[in-house]
Amino acid sequence: MPEQNHARHSVVLSETILNVSTAEPIQFIDLTDRINQHLTENEVENGTVTVFSRHTTAAIKINEAEDLLIEDFKNMLRELCPSGRTYNHNDMSRRQPPIAPDERPNAHSHLMHLLLSTSETIPVIDGRLALGTWQRIFMVELDGARQRQVMIRCESYHPHEKAETVELRAVEGGIGRSSAANQRALP
């Protein structure tokens, strides 16, 4: 019977927040290079990365970065969820408090988000995102122009002889300003 390898692995967690400024009501912003930069800076070789939008009117999607196709995406979203329709959410006189003082009539943006998604999880192999040839990771603004936050969270797997702790690195304000934080061992 062949000998089985039961090597234990440790997991290193790294997180960062990307601050993203948007300029258009519907805008596709390619985050792929910034995510690859985070992988390099945090020495993520093998594992997964989750890209998460902290908003209900900004989505995360993987697709092709071709200008005409992106215009088709925008047109589809506008046709499915037009801004000029009457929506219950936009009737501030009927809304339950609390209502933000700068609340926008943006039901169409929330409906578009429902068709997309809040996050994507991508495998990382040999330090690179395991994306297909044409795949790119987008933050999709649905209610711009705004300031947005996108979380990048990596789980990197290491054999025990390389790493014996789980290290959580938190970065506020963008890539490149890493500060080491809580370290704890995994069972």
Please report, for each region that a protein language model flagged, where it lies by residue:
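Active-site histidine-anchored catalytic micro-motif
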Residues: 2-187
